[in-house]
Amino acid sequence: MTVALSNLPVLETERLILRAPCASDFPALAPFIMSDRSKYVGGGADKDETHAWRVLAILTGHWPLRGFGTFVLEDRKTGAPIGSAGPWYPAGWPEKELGWTIWTEEAEGKGFAYEAVLELRRHTYEDLGWTTAVSYIDPKNTRSIALAERLGCTLDPDAAGPDPDEPLLVYRHPSPEALA
């Protein structure tokens, strides 16, 4: 028996369908989590399928716990899941985050994360009523730093990160008013 999360939003952009994660995303997510490409988001070559499954379960479980969560980025042309992005706010975190990952090298550098985050930022401000959002980024993750800056985010050196033992850069997204 498969149980689906119902009544979750599905958003669309020119090239993407943004939807909640599901079990069929595992074959695309697992290789990413088990590679060094995911080292900035809790994965890495030392991780196994069990760890990757837990990541999928965490992404999925955030939805019923918070009423929002990370979306899977599905390529409209191929139907393939190519990444994830969206609102994220685990217990104990100082602020609500907009995060993103691209799962395959083939999908990197094509603007998919940018396209998704623009729509997801609109969604969080207009539909969820957020008034601010940050993105927590590892200082070595130059691609995500560049994307945050392209999105108009600014480094907020006074903002706290989620873990004092893991120093992350805090990039603040423009406010809804600044984007209007």
List PLM regions with ranges:
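Acyl-donor (CoA/ACP) binding surface of acyl/acetyltransferases
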Residues: 1-45, 57, 70-180
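Active-site rim helix/loop that mediates acceptor-substrate recognition in acyltransferases
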Residues: 48-67, 76
